């Protein structure tokens, strides 16, 4: 039994390595990092503009800012927060042409994410008009669902805080797992819904779990390194936030793509088991 498990694990790692080489995930993460830096302002503008139209999402907006501070760039959250506030204020004085151009940039980022993840599954790209319709729906309805999720999270926090006042420690322990569970759920939905092919949700959940673990541990390790070895501030000075942010976005996308690749490889393992695919054929594509 142990020998069978080890054989399957070796095969899994071999397939994963081949697919990693084929899809050039490191380069893909770099391309997404560049696109993210260009599109982060439009995305922030759209999200908080929609939040401002719904007074019920005021607390959710504050929660989202906290989430961005904690995850967008560990150890540089305060600076990023100031930039976000400035972006939102400046967007209110923009012309219609400027707003349309920023929205176009945001749509292009969503398009690149879609193409990159579909390349991992070697699935065909969707029709352009159909794709843009989906992207626009995500861009407009996405913030509403984000606001609802953060509003629910705020409600849970209030309940748990009440339990804490009563001396019930379970609530505080549950609260510490909420960010991880939200990250896991988000990655699971991305791996299930974005590929233009059928994806087994169990495989997506496994890939998302690995990505969420890497993301969470990476965030803590990155923040610890920046706090313990602050030499980057001496080198870059006032510009230190930029390389920190670029590096963390690069790592974040790499974790997400690794989880997506693992999900796809689990599907390959099923095909190998059924005899519809073999490791030799996978290696030939790598060469």
From Swiss-Prot:
InterPro entries: UPF0761_bac, Virul_fac_BrkB. This is UPF0761 membrane protein MS0032. The keyword Nucleus does not apply. The chain crosses the membrane at residues 37-57, 93-113, 128-148, 174-194, 204-224, 238-258. Keywords: Cell inner membrane, Cell membrane, Membrane, Transmembrane, Transmembrane helix. It is found in: Cell inner membrane. One of its GO terms (cellular component) is plasma membrane. Belongs to the UPF0761 family. It holds the Pfam family Virul_fac_BrkB. It is a multi-pass membrane protein. It comes from Mannheimia succiniciproducens (strain KCTC 0769BP / MBEL55E).
């Amino acid at each position: 039994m142990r020998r069978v498990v080890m054989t399957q694990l070796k095969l899994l790692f071999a397939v994963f390595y081949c697919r990693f080489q084929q899809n050039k995930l490191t380069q893909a993460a770099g391309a997404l990092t560049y696109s993210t830096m260009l599109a982060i302002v439009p995305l922030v503008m759209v999200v908080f503009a929609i939040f401002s139209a719904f007074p019920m999402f005021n607390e959710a907006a504050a929660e989202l800012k906290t989430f961005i501070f904690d995850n967008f760039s560990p150890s540089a959250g305060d600076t990023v927060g100031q930039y976000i506030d400035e972006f939102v204020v400046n967007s209110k004085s923009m012309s219609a042409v400027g707003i349309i151009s920023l929205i176009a940039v945001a749509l292009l980022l969503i398009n690149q994410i879609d193409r990159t993840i579909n390349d991992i599954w070697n699935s065909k790209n969707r029709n352009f008009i159909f794709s843009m319709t989906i992207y626009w729906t995500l861009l407009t309805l996405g913030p509403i669902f984000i606001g609802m999720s953060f509003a629910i999270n705020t409600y849970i926090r209030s309940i748990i805080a009440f339990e804490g006042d009563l001396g019930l420690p379970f609530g505080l322990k549950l609260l510490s797992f909420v960010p991880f569970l939200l990250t896991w759920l988000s990655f699971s939905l991305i791996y299930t819904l974005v590929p233009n092919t059928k994806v087994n949700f169990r495989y997506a959940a496994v890939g998302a779990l690995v990505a969420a673990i890497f993301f969470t541990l990476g965030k803590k390790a990155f923040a610890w390194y920046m706090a313990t070895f602050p030499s980057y501030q001496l080198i870059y000075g006032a510009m230190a936030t930029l390389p920190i942010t670029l590096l963390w976005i690069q790592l974040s996308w790499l974790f997400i793509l690794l989880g997506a690749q693992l999900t796809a490889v689990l599907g390959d393992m099923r095909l190998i088991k059924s005899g519809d695919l073999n490791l030799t054929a996978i290696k030939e594509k790598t060469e």
